[in-house]
């Protein structure tokens, strides 16, 4: 047994912050920008309830404060945009005929508008829709000229502002998944050893395979998140989920590329597939957008966050609300309260009946142990469910069952501790001893007792693997009443 238990502790943020009894199992991801780019402002967000971030300062917070927060890097992907506009904006009306060009960066007028897509004239066809500024403006292709310009007729007009995004919902674009900028950014992500990297505009599973190959070539432990925001990704969703380490429902562009009425069902299907494959899933975009400049969310936003929790998302994400909003910490705190209330009153815990292990699966035996650990924890009304993992697989599987009992994961892999911050219900601890299984379980119970998570008389379900030194898949299950 360890002589000094404290050196193995992951200092759980909820315990140290005095809110261990209000731990929210659905995690919060916050985007960092000018509104929260200082150490003190970031610390406010962390104390409010954030579990994963896109930021540099987090490492300092993880070192100096009692938190383990994930760092998530975002690759922009092939985002198409219009160029500059004369007078800062170009009024367009239904029926206007415009010319799009990718050959020269002209200042936009009704005669010619630059679009940052060299293959535009090759990929679009007459009749294809082109959406601009998140779908606020819509045009349709009426002609493709011999010299490579694209003539369009305005369907829905307004003011065409500079640098606004362009979506091609009817077109299969031929750009690579990663741009030159993405490749440079990936080098930085690898160098900085970020926990997660999100790939934008994933279209097919090969996009994820390529990114994972690049990470593997550099011996990087960074895990990959596939952002689902293209109809083609939905067509290949099963394979993308299987190949990715996690998935993000990126509803901004998805809601432009798809008819808006199809987005709710798409979100639910993505979440369902991720839970069935034990892959963390994040619901993102415009969740609390009114709080960019207000102190209270719209009622529809409250329901949106609640529905994401009820559908089983591992995490919900804030974007402009924390990056550029006026009240970043208040937004996080408000979201945390919504999550806690839903989990307290309405959440459908224990999904193991939906996820019975399949005998043909290569991981059937370890899956069966995890499945029955969650079932046993439920039947015994256990006060804690404890898992051990080296790769993270056991943690992801146990989390996917959404167990009623508090879930604690121990790992000797320090890189995993932060990565697991994204998973539903997981509180992770670093523990590197490899003695007898009885000693390891004794240590785990002592650590959890020391932190105030369990006490004498509590029932605890443990999983592990034997023999310890062989690091096999989970193959052991034990239930204990603490003395």
Predicted regions, residues:
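Non-catalytic helical/linker scaffolds that mediate oligomerization, partner binding
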Residues: 1-483
């Amino acid at each position: 047994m360890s002589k000094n238990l404290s050196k193995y502790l992951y200092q759980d943020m909820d315990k140290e912050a005095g809110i261990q009894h209000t731990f929210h199992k659905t995690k919060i991801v916050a985007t960092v920008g000018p509104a929260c780019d200082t150490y003190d402002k970031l610390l406010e967000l962390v104390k409010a309830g954030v579990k994963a971030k896109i930021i540099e300062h987090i490492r300092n917070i993880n070192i100096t404060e009692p938190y383990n927060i994930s760092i998530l890097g975002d690759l922009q992907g092939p985002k198409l945009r219009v160029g500059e506009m004369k007078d800062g904006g170009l009024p367009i009306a239904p029926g206007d005929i415009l010319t799009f060009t990718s050959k020269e960066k002209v200042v936009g007028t009704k005669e010619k508008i630059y679009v940052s897509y060299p293959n535009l004239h090759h990929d679009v066809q007459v009749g294809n829709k082109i959406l601009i500024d998140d779908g606020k403006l819509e045009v349709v292709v009426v002609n493709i000229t011999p010299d490579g310009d694209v003539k369009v007729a305005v369907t829905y007009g307004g003011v065409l502002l500079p640098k606004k995004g362009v979506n091609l919902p009817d077109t299969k674009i031929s750009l690579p998944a990663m741009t030159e900028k993405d490749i440079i950014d990936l080098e930085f992500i690898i160098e900085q050893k970020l926990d997660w990297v999100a790939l934008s505009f994933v279209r097919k599973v090969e996009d994820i395979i390529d990114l994972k190959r690049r990470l593997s070539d550099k011996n990087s432990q960074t895990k990959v998140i596939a952002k689902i925001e293209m109809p083609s990704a939905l067509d290949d969703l099963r394979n993308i989920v299987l190949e990715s380490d996690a998935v993000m429902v990126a509803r901004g562009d998805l809601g432009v590329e798809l008819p808006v009425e199809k987005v709710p069902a798409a979100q639910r299907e993505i979440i369902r597939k991720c839970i069935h494959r034990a892959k963390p899933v994040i619901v993102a975009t415009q969740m609390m957008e009114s709080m960019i400049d207000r102190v209270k969310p719209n009622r529809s936003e409250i329901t949106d966050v609640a529905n994401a929790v009820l559908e089983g998302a591992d995490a919900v994400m804030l974007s402009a609300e924390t990056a550029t909003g006026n009240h970043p910490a208040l937004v996080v705190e408000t979201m945390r309260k919504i999550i806690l209330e839903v989990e307290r009153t309405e959440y459908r815990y224990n999904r193991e009946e939906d996820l019975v292990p399949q005998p043909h699966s290569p991981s059937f035996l370890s899956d069966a142990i995890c499945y029955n650990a969650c079932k046993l924890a439920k039947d015994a009304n256990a006060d804690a469910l404890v898992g051990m993992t080296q790769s993270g697989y056991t943690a992801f599987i146990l989390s996917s069952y959404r167990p009623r009992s508090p879930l604690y994961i121990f790992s000797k892999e320090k890189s995993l501790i932060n990565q697991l911050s994204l998973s539903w219900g997981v509180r992770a601890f670093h523990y590197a001893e490899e003695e007898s299984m009885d000693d390891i379980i004794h240590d785990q119970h002592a650590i959890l007792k020391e932190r105030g998570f369990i006490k004498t008389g509590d029932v605890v379900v443990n999983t592990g693997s034997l023999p310890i030194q062989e690091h096999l898949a989970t193959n052991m299950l034990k239930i204990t009443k603490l003395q």
